């Protein structure tokens, strides 16, 4: 077992840094070493779909060469003896060039005892058999699924079939592969390009959303575009939501917010009010009191809606478009308070 680091993420190097720091501190405290499984990345389609649905940038690198370069960059640091002792390395790859590089580098650095090769059962079996004959420690793994989750196995199979038949994938070209052929030279050039790039590859993540920053209003546009969801994987957004908790968590000594009733352009605080209690505090703290309309006020609201004194019915489509954008931007500015209000009133 090990903690996976996926090289197709630009910030994978930073994840490795966190693991190294934790593993070294753990060993210094008398604990056992950890293990990092280094993979290229296996959820590209899912990452792409989720990013599209949530309005986020795609988090993965844009080319296979960049992914391979990042893999080699992380691998080199992982195999340094002072790192490999604390954080053992599982080199998960079916690429002969990557495997050979890891094999030679680990022996050059003297860290081979802390490294294993990992391969999927049933894929490139001749490669792991050859490695075993060389005395390498090879771990074979296979997905396991219960009968009731068989659809997950089907989706996994389809994903692997798609991945392993991609034009740039090593396994696509691995059958009857021989040194000196055009296919061999193509794969060799792939590896050499990645090797040249490994020391200049950047580690800047594509997702930099920061809800702590002031909201930037969105100008009107002809095409509707949803506001991106909050990415709670990001540390700054986690801090933002903790601040919301702190702001909206009332104590019994705090006075509740008084919510007025709106009648047309006027607001009225009614004598009759409904109390909303904080569900997260066992309904012991009142968050707000909502004004409740009487029969006369309800009739006045209906009259205003019927007569339309503000002239809403006469506004043009362009005017409504502008107003709706202003309302959307205002909601964006108040996002934190809206979430805080919901957290206070809705049990979680």
Language model regions located:
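Positively charged, amphipathic and often flexible ligand-engagement surfaces
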Residues: 1-222
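Terminal low-complexity tails and localization/encapsulation signals of metabolic enzymes
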Residues: 147-303, 307-310, 314-329, 333, ...
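Conserved helicase NTPase catalytic core signature
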Residues: 343
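Conserved small/polar residues in nucleotide/adenosyl-binding loops
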Residues: 347-348
